[in-house]
């Protein structure tokens, strides 16, 4: 393989050489991502609502649309929320997600993957109340005025909630892997390291 200007490559080609004229486009090596959550990202693209909207109202609207498609006890899941990309420049709250549903549990993950947002029904299912101490390795967000839970869940405090989420079927895992593989390939990634896998 040789890359360069046409004048620099003159005379290098043989009878079986394939010549590509990229017409001024840039050639780069395949990218390597040494820390990515391949499987879980693929699964979320299949099971969760994309929360990359400009306003919290728009995000709530997307979640409401999903809630209307699900049964009354089905978890409504969202992902890719980023407070810094919204007009409001704030976190989602329990009140925001209660507007999605008071009967269906709702959970949304932050784009960074270390903060989660839930509604009152989700807190009730897990057994979190205003008197619940912070779980080991995490924090329960609270209203600074009265100490009540505001629906923001930090780090490992989400683990008790995860135990209540629906199981992911092998079919969804496979579909998610196929989807994320195509997305990574389209972005130019040729090698990745999944930073968290399970025995499943």
Predicted feature locations:
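Divalent metal-binding segments
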Residues: 1-200
């Amino acid at each position: 393989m040789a890359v360069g200007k046409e004048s620099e490559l003159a005379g290098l080609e043989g009878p079986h050489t394939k010549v590509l004229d990229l017409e001024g486009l840039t050639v780069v090596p395949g990218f390597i991502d040494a820390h990515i959550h391949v499987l879980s990202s693929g699964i979320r693209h299949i099971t969760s609502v994309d929360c990359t909207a400009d306003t919290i109202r728009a995000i709530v609207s997307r979640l409401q649309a999903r809630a209307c498609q699900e049964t009354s006890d089905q978890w409504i899941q969202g992902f890719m929320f980023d407070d810094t990309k919204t007009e409001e420049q704030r976190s989602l709250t329990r009140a925001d997600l209660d507007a999605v549903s008071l009967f269906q549990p709702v959970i949304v993950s932050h784009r960074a993957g270390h903060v989660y947002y839930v509604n009152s029904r989700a807190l009730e299912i897990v057994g979190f109340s205003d008197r619940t101490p912070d779980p080991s390795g995490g924090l329960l967000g609270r209203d600074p005025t009265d100490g009540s839970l505001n629906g923001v869940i930090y780090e490992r405090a989400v683990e008790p909630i995860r135990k209540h989420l629906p199981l992911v079927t092998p079919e969804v895992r496979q579909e998610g892997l196929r989807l994320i593989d195509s997305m990574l390939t389209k972005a130019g990634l040729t090698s990745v390291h999944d930073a968290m896998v399970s025995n499943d």
